[in-house]
Curated annotation (Swiss-Prot):
Keywords: Coiled coil. Residues 61-246 form a coiled coil. This is Coiled-coil domain-containing protein 152. The keyword Coiled coil applies. InterPro entries: CCDC152. Detected in stomach.
């Protein structure tokens, strides 16, 4: 019994060992397959990671593009809104322009009416000014005629004064000449009397002779001054008379 059991055990052990070897082979085969699959999975995982990175980069780029597009859309919306507002403003401006045109036409007509009124008033004032100018001219003519009469009388008066002064000047010159001749004769007579005296009195005659000469010279100077004053007065009157005649001629020309 022991041998049979021992043989049975050996048989069982042999069977279990073959099975174990077979199982190990299967396990090893599966492990190889699993390692191959793991390698493939690692490669696929690496590819997936690369693809994920690419997709993430694309996602970022797409998000940026979306943000850009969003901003563009927002800008377009604002542009559309602005254009709509402009359209409303244009409509309002058009209405305002029409109102301004109407007001301009009204003002233009009012301006034309005012111009016509001013032209009419200017014509009336022009006629009035012409009448006033004519009246002033007539008044000036009358004043000029009166001034001419007064000026003529003044000229005649000045001419008479000049004539009287000339006569006075001639009279004074004649009187001066007579006085000079008289003094000269007296001086000559006294000089002759003195010269007939003795030589002892010759020195005493020097003083009277010089005195007479100084008196004669002083008298001549005084008369010359009076004559110069009269001549200046006559010259001044003649100049005034000449100026008065020139102004009179100018007024007559005017």
């Amino acid at each position: 019994m022991d041998q049979s059991s021992e043989g049975c055990m050996k048989k069982i052990s042999s069977v279990n060992l073959d099975k174990l070897i077979n199982d190990f082979s299967q396990i090893e085969k599966k492990m190889v397959e699993t390692n191959g699959k793991n390698n493939i999975l690692d490669i696929q995982l690496e590819k997936s990671n690369c693809l994920l990175k690419v997709m993430q980069a694309k996602e970022v780029s797409i998000k940026e593009e979306c943000a850009t597009l969003h901003n563009i859309i927002k800008g377009l919306q604002q542009t559309i809104e602005y254009q709509q507002n402009l359209k409303g403003e244009n409509e309002q401006l058009k209405i305002s322009a029409d109102l301004i045109k109407e007001k301009l036409k009204s003002h233009e007509q009012e301006y034309k009416n005012n111009i016509a009124k001013l032209v009419s008033e200017m014509k009336i004032k022009e006629e009035g000014y012409k009448k006033e100018i004519s009246k002033l001219y007539q008044d000036m003519q009358r004043k000029v005629e009166l001034n001419e009469e007064k000026h003529k009388e003044l000229i005649e008066k000045k001419e008479m004064e000049i004539s009287e002064l000339n006569a006075k000047l001639r009279s004074q010159e004649k009187e001066k000449q007579n006085e000079i001749i008289k003094l000269q004769l007296e001086f000559d007579a006294k000089l002759a009397r003195v010269q007939t005296k003795s030589k002892s009195y010759q020195d005493s005659t020097v003083l009277p002779q010089s005195i007479y000469r100084r008196k004669l010279q002083h008298f001549q100077e005084e008369k010359n001054k009076e004559i110069a004053i009269l001549r200046n007065t006559i010259r001044d009157l003649e100049q005034r008379l000449s100026v008065g005649k020139d102004s009179h001629l100018k007024r007559r020309r005017f």
